[in-house]
Regions:
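Cofactor-/ligand-binding subdomain signature composed of acidic, glycine-rich
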Residues: 115-121, 132-173, 369-396
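Short alpha-helices
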Residues: 96-141, 489, 493
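Thiamine diphosphate
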Residues: 1-15, 22, 32, 141-306, ...
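Anionic-ligand anchoring segments at beta-strand to alpha-helix junctions in alpha/beta enzyme folds, i.e.
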Residues: 2-67, 198-233, 436-443, 448-452, ...
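Flexible, low-complexity linker and terminal segments
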Residues: 177, 184-198, 328, 333-532
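ADP-ribose/adenylate-binding Rossmann-like module
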Residues: 82-99
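Conserved thiamine diphosphate
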Residues: 71-73, 122, 295-342, 531
Length: 532
């Protein structure tokens, strides 16, 4: 198993923790490291306690880790909140930390506390043996050739050299050549790249954490891509605009989080009856109501699957990694176009806002389209009617005709199942215990399996789509003695969903409902009885 290092920067909001962390990630990428990051922040503009952490290795790393290699606090009274994450080997720097770092004194001649985050990067670079010239290049690319951040970085590096010489290169990284074409993207940006490659040309959204990043990303792309991005007055308007765009022939999507998606439910139903393919990007956060606006959870699975009133076809995709988020955007657009149904891409704050090293595929994906009755066409006629209707859109109420139309509509689900991404198995054929996951929890489980001394006893089955359910999935569980479900909610919604389709009862579940991710260290501990 390769060494995975985790660095965490903490302090108050407004201290540039996220921007400093992303600069650190770019430095890591330039040293050939694979990485994934995670940030926490309260729902405050200033104040509170913010964090940024990044786990990295010279080999692929799937998830952030809980235990820290190095922790830097930009102000007093912050590092103490993370004592449970420290080990005997952890280094802790800060104004009041075990390894005193007088940031206020170091930044005074540079221009103030705004540069404390870059001073901290200098200390990190010293401890990991980063190439200062590479660090300088990344700082220049991020800011400018004459940026005070260069002076700030050197001040941190020099202070560490003078005061922490015993920690020089204490963490031995394997520097690789930078991965060609590699990017640092969060889950929403990965989805956005896939959306553009897949021919998406209309996006509407009202800002709502944690989906807002996709709105910002695609809005910027209007300058270079044939896409229209709108920010209307609320979520209902956003969904309605996307539906109108789809009716006019666009490959359209709309984005939101749980409370916003609740407002869009009538539109989901309208898409289902009017045969309009729209993609809904649903980035979950803890609920109910406002819940925990800036934290993470997987509590909206059943909400997505059973969204809308009445009975109609819909598709729910559940990507688990940045690469899957990219692919899910392409698949969602194609499925919406092929079957003219609403497609919900369900992610969460952890995946949507965490960045990772990612290399976009070089292939050009196939763009699937279906015959459309476009408004204004001389050779076709169709009404997108919210009433039950016949094939031309005319309202109907005759009992026999209604039954025929409803039966024909719902029968499409058998065909849809054949086009959905299939469950993916990871592990040995000798495994007797099977873990089931969906969404971002896959990342932590994969990392945990890599940390086990005897991983051959454990297999992982990940579901990149969860609706419609293929009843044949039940056959995949038969070879295993133990079935474990791991997900980031309180009630094991995956278990409930599977049990609605066929007899299903897991051996055990590992659940989390505190707004934080499930970490691989938790999973390793949970799996001990099954690998001993």
């Amino acid at each position: 198993m390769s060494s995975v290092f985790t660095v965490k920067i903490v302090g108050p909001a407004g201290a540039g923790i996220k921007s400093g962390g992303l600069l650190l990630s770019r430095i890591l990428l330039s040293h050939g490291q694979h990485l994934i990051d995670y940030s926490e922040y309260p729902s405050l503009v200033r104040g509170g306690h913010n964090t940024y952490q990044v786990s990295f290795s010279h080999q692929p790393v799937s998830s952030i880790h809980y235990q820290l290699s190095l922790l830097i606090s930009l102000e007093p009274n912050h590092w103490q909140l993370h004592k449970t994450e420290l080990t005997k080997k952890s280094l802790v720097f800060g104004p009041d930390a075990p390894l005193v770092l007088p940031l206020s004194d170091l930044v005074k001649p540079i221009g103030g506390h705004i540069y404390a985050n870059t001073v901290a990067l200098g200390v990190i670079a010293y401890c990991f043996g980063f190439d200062p010239s590479i660090c300088h290049s990344e700082i220049i690319n991020t800011f400018s050739l004459d940026s005070p951040n260069l002076t700030a970085f050197d001040a941190g590096f020099q202070y560490a050299q003078n005061n922490f010489i015993q920690y020089q290169d204490i963490f031995k990284i394997h520097s690789n050549a930078p991965v060609k074409r590699a990017l640092i993207v969060d889950g929403s940006e990965a989805f956005g790249h896939g959306f553009l490659v897949g021919g998406g040309n209309f996006y509407a959204a009202y800002p709502m954490t944690p989906s807002t990043g996709l709105l910002h990303f695609l809005a910027q792309k209007q300058l270079t891509h044939p896409i229209t991005v709108l920010h209307p007055e609320d979520e209902i308007s956003s969904a309605s605009l996307a539906v109108g765009a789809a009716f006019a022939g666009a490959r359209a999507a709309v984005g939101t989080s749980g409370g916003g998606f609740a407002l869009m439910n009538e539109t989901v139903s309208f898409c289902g009856v009017a045969n309009l393919g729209v993609v809904f990007y649903l980035a979950s956060r803890p609920g109910p109501a406002t819940g925990l606006p800036t934290w993470t959870a997987q509590g909206d699975l059943l909400h997505a699957v059973f969204s809308g009133h009445g009975e109609f076809n819909k598709i729910v995709l559940t990507p688990g990694t940045h690469a899957e988020s990219y692919q899910a955007a392409i698949e969602a657009l194609n499925l919406a176009a092929r079957f003219d149904v609403p497609v919900i891409v369900l992610t969460d704050k952890l995946l949507a806002e965490s960045s990772a090293s990612f290399t976009p595929p070089t292939y050009i994906p196939k763009v699937v389209s279906s015959p459309r009755h476009l408004p204004g066409s001389d050779d076709s006629f169709y009404m997108a009617n919210s009433y039950e209707h016949d094939q031309n859109g005319f309202s109907i109420e005759d009992a026999s005709l209604v039954k025929k139309v409803v039966t024909a509509r719902l029968s499409l689900s058998k065909k849809i199942v054949k086009y959905l991404p299939k469950p993916v198995f990871y592990g040995s054929d000798q495994a007797k215990t099977l873990i089931l996951t969906w969404g971002s929890t896959k990342m932590a489980v994969l990392e945990a399996l890599n940390m086990l001394d005897n991983p051959s006893k454990i297999g992982l089955l990940h579901f990149p789509s969860l609706w419609p359910i293929n009843p044949n999935w039940a056959l995949m569980f038969k070879p295993f003695k133990n079935i474990l479900v791991i997900e980031n909610n309180a009630t094991s919604q995956l278990s409930t969903l599977l049990a609605s389709a066929f007899p299903f009862k897991p051996t055990s579940t590992l659940l989390n409902c505190d707004g934080r991710p499930i970490y691989p260290e938790q999973i390793v501990k949970y799996l001990k009885p099954y690998v001993s």
